[in-house]
């Protein structure tokens, strides 16, 4: 056994061959003996394999073992225990084994038989012959004696059967430990044993009689051992799982065998064999056949399956078979989900309770699949209904849909067609709101289209704030993207930006910012790019050269920007990147802020100097206002300014067109020479001049970029890391947002 066990089990042994291992054992015999003395709980197989792996260096092996770096093979550990029990069993072998043996032996013997088949393929098949099996009888006893020892006397009748699989020959051995473990089982088996002796190999027939004879207590015990034997048989690959299928009663593996330890303990589905006797035996046979193909090599076990099924009829009430759990899984996954067996109740006491679901499981399994499908359909139906309701709720709660619907009336009426369906419900409850909201939010989104920009200045922030409050109320559930302008392209809707887009950013409330911007704009329209009512006007004012710094000073009055600037309108006009534009500091320009706001618009970053009440935008802005509807409202410079141009301001570095010349740095701060033309303009106007100077050369938006390149000087103001010249933030966000970007 040991050598075969080595070859079969110790996969770790590099010398899987018995011969090689034996030779190694010979060379390391002294080390082996010393190790065996030092570690009596280890088997020679393990120790010899360790020695072989470590070149028979005793110290290394001892170190590994002592430090738990090496562990015994579990099956061998348990077998070592089994050997101890075998010794006990050998002592009991002389006990009247014949009394107990055959009837129960069929169950456990089949399980044990299969179990050892797993361990020892070589011996397992010949085990059908009585001679080999009887010789192996003590080994067969090993796994079961553990279980039986735990099962104690009640289990003994079944355990005694474990050894008897081969036939009456094994019976004495099985009776030995069985007799030791349980004499009650022996008594019952004495009756059955007479029958079983008559039919030791046809064990099928004797079992049904003795098991019905078996007492109820023993029936539970039988169930227990069957579970144990079944556990082993289940785990032994060659062992016929059929007995497992039928006998996989609530497995109570009792540490006895590695198989029991390894086997997941399927207590989930104890089935009474009454149900099994009819439908389950059929299913088991079909499934058993399924597994027979796998485990056919064991013949005696197949016989025993029939035996187990017969006792199932006899013991039907109490032998719970968890087989369905093992069997049902291979057959179909759905019935498992639908199976009535609750995995929570696993105790044997629940067997009877669960026998009904067990019966129903097979009976119901087919309808269960149907029911489960129906349930799924119902669930999906509910889910769909819920989704519809939720979607409707979302849309109901989305002012944006309504805004979008109106904005989309402009942008896409197709979407309206879709949304009215969704929003019709939303509109009906909210129609009282819609007349308000569409008026208010619609307009901010209508201005999304540059054509409606003139309306934008007309809309007060109050409406925006109201709509925004409504939005906030209804943003509790909102479709994330509905918030944003539906214009897929920033050029289109960018002009409504501040309210429609940034105001809506989920994490940020820009309402205060817009208000501040509006206030700041009045004081210094250029100070906040909001002051530049439209990108187009903003950039165009910049693009058009200020006739003089004086004009720039007057620009506030002259520029349509300032005229347009109502704190109400400013909210919409606050230059901001179209939706989704990152808020980064672009290396050249932040496209939609400061410089970027009109990108050619005002010298450096939205020149702060302009903040002093002179919007840098010139009266010239209005002639370009037609362009406002153009790209980003900066119709002139168009995309070129939309993206920061490396040379746009004559220098890659945004704040100072060229490295600030000392004169410019002074003048930039004192007052940037607008393109050095209005160099004397006070700093407040100076930056405005810078931007305007940029706009001077940008008089033609096309020319702006080269002109800017011509004006390396624009904002002498070195707008270094501080970027404090971003008026567009109205002081709202100082330097902090740019801190990380160097």
Swiss-Prot record:
Q: Where is the composition biased (Basic residues)?
A: 1-14
Its Gene Ontology molecular function terms? Answer: DNA binding; ubiquitin binding
The GO annotation for biological process reads: DNA repair
Q: Composition bias, kind Acidic residues: at what positions?
A: 198-210
Give the span(s) annotated as Disordered. Answer: 1-30, 79-494, 642-742
Localisation: Cytoplasm; Nucleus; Chromosome, Telomere
- Where along the chain is composition biased (Polar residues)? 681-700
Tree of life domain: Eukaryota
Q: Which GO terms describe its cellular component?
A: chromosome, telomeric region; cytoplasm; nucleus
Task: Quote the PROSITE patterns the UniProt record gives.
Answer: CUE (PS51140)
Quote the biased-composition stretches of kind Low complexity, using this chain's numbering. 16-29, 93-109, 152-176, 224-241, 299-324, 336-348, 371-494, 663-680, 701-733
Q: How is it modified after translation?
A: Ubiquitinated.
Which UniProt key words apply to this protein? Chromosome, Cytoplasm, DNA damage, DNA repair, DNA-binding, Nucleus, Telomere, Ubl conjugation, Ubl conjugation pathway
What are the residue boundaries of the CUE domain, all occurrences included? 27-70
Task: Establish whether keyword DNA damage is in the entry.
Answer: yes
Compositional bias annotation for Basic and acidic residues? 79-90, 110-125
For this protein, the record's InterPro entries field holds: CUE, DEF1_CUE
Q: Spell out the coiled coil positions from the record.
A: none
The UniProt family comment states: Belongs to the DEF1 family.
Q: What does this protein do?
A: Recruits the ubiquitination machinery to RNA polymerase II for polyubiquitination, removal and degradation, when the transcription-coupled repair (TCR) factor RAD26 fails to efficiently displace stalled RNA polymerase II. Also involved in telomere length regulation. Binds DNA.
Quaternary structure (record): Homodimer; may form higher order oligomers. Interacts with the large RNA polymerase II subunit RPO21; the interaction is direct and serves to bridge RPO21 to the Elongin complex in a manner dependent on transcription stress. Interacts with RAD26.
* Protein name as catalogued: RNA polymerase II degradation factor 1
Native species = Debaryomyces hansenii (strain ATCC 36239 / CBS 767 / BCRC 21394 / JCM 1990 / NBRC 0083 / IGC 2968) (Yeast)
């Amino acid at each position: 056994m040991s050598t075969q066990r080595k070859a079969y089990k110790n996969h770790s042994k590099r010398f899987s061959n018995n011969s090689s291992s034996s030779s190694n054992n010979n060379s390391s015999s002294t080390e082996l003996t010393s190790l065996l003395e030092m570690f009596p709980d280890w088997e020679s197989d393990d120790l010899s394999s360790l020695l072989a792996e470590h070149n028979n260096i005793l110290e290394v092996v001892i170190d590994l073992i002592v430090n738990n770096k090496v562990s015994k093979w579990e099956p061998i550990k348990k077998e070592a225990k089994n050997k101890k029990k075998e010794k006990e069993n050998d002592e009991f072998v002389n006990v009247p084994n014949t009394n107990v043996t055959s009837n129960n032996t069929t169950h456990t013997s089949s399980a044990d038989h299969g179990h050892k088949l797993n361990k020892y393929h070589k011996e397992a098949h010949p085990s059908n012959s009585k001679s080999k099996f009887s010789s192996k009888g003590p080994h067969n006893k090993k796994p079961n004696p553990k279980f039986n020892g735990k099962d104690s006397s009640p289990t003994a009748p079944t355990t005694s059967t474990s050894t008897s699989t081969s036939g009456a020959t094994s019976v004495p051995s099985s009776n030995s430990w069985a007799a030791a473990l349980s004499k009650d089982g022996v008594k019952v088996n004495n009756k059955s044993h007479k029958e079983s002796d008559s039919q030791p190999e046809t064990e099928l027939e004797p079992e049904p009689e003795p098991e019905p004879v078996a007492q109820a207590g023993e029936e539970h015990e039988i169930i227990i051992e069957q579970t144990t034997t079944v556990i082993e048989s289940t785990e032994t690959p060659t062992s016929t799982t059929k007995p497992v299928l039928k006998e996989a009663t609530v497995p109570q593996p009792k540490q006895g065998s590695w198989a029991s330890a390894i086997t997941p303990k399927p207590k989930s589905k104890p089935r009474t064999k009454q149900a099994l006797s009819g439908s389950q035996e059929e299913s088991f046979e079909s499934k058993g056949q399924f597994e027979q193909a796998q485990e056919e090599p064991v013949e005696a076990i197949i016989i025993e399956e029939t035996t187990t099924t017969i006792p199932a009829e006899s013991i039907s009430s109490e032998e719970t078979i968890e087989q369905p759990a093992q069997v049902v899984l291979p057959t179909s996954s759905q019935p498992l989900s639908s199976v009535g067996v609750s995995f929570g109740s696993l105790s044997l006491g629940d067997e009877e309770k669960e026998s009904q679901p067990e019966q129903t499981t097979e009976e119901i399994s087919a309808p269960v699949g149907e029911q489960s499908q129906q349930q799924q359909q119902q669930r999906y139906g509910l889910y769909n209904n819920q989704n519809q309701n939720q979607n409707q709720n979302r849309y109901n709660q989305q002012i944006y849909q309504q805004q979008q619907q109106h904005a989309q009336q402009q942008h896409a009426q197709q979407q309206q067609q879709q949304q009215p369906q969704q929003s019709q419900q939303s509109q009906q409850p909210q129609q009282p709101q819609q007349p308000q909201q569409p008026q208010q939010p619609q307009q901010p989104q209508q201005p999304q289209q540059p054509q409606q920009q003139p309306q934008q200045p007309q809309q007060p922030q109050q409406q925006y704030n109201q709509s925004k409050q409504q939005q906030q109320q209804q943003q509790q559930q909102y479709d994330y993207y509905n918030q944003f302008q539906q214009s897929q392209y920033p050029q289109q809707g960018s002009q409504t930006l501040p309210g429609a887009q940034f105001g809506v950013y989920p994490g940020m409330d820009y309402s205060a910012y817009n208000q501040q911007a509006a206030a700041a704009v009045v004081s210094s329209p250029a100070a906040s790019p909001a002051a530049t009512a439209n990108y187009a006007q903003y950039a165009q004012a910049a693009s058009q050269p200020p006739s003089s710094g004086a004009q720039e000073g007057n620009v506030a009055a002259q520029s349509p920007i300032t005229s347009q600037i109502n704190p109400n309108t400013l909210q919409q006009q606050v230059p901001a990147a179209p939706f989704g534009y990152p808020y980064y500091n672009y290396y050249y320009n932040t496209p939609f802020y400061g410089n970027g706001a009109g990108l050619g618009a005002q010298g450096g970053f939205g020149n702060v100097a302009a903040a002093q009440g002179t919007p840098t935008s010139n009266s010239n802005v209005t002639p370009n206002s037609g362009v406002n509807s153009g790209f980003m409202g900066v119709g002139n410079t168009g995309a070129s300014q939309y993206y920061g141009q490396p040379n746009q301001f004559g220098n890659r570095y945004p704040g100072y067109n060229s490295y600030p010349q000392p004169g410019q740095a002074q003048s930039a701060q004192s007052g940037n020479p607008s393109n050095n033309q209005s160099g004397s303009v006070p700093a407040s106007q100076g930056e405005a001049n810078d931007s305007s100077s940029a706009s001077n050369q940008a008089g033609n938006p096309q020319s702006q970029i080269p002109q800017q390149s011509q004006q390396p000087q624009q904002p002498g103001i070195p707008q270094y890391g501080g970027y404090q010249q971003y008026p567009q933030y109205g002081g709202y966000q100082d330097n902090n947002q740019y801190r990380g970007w160097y």
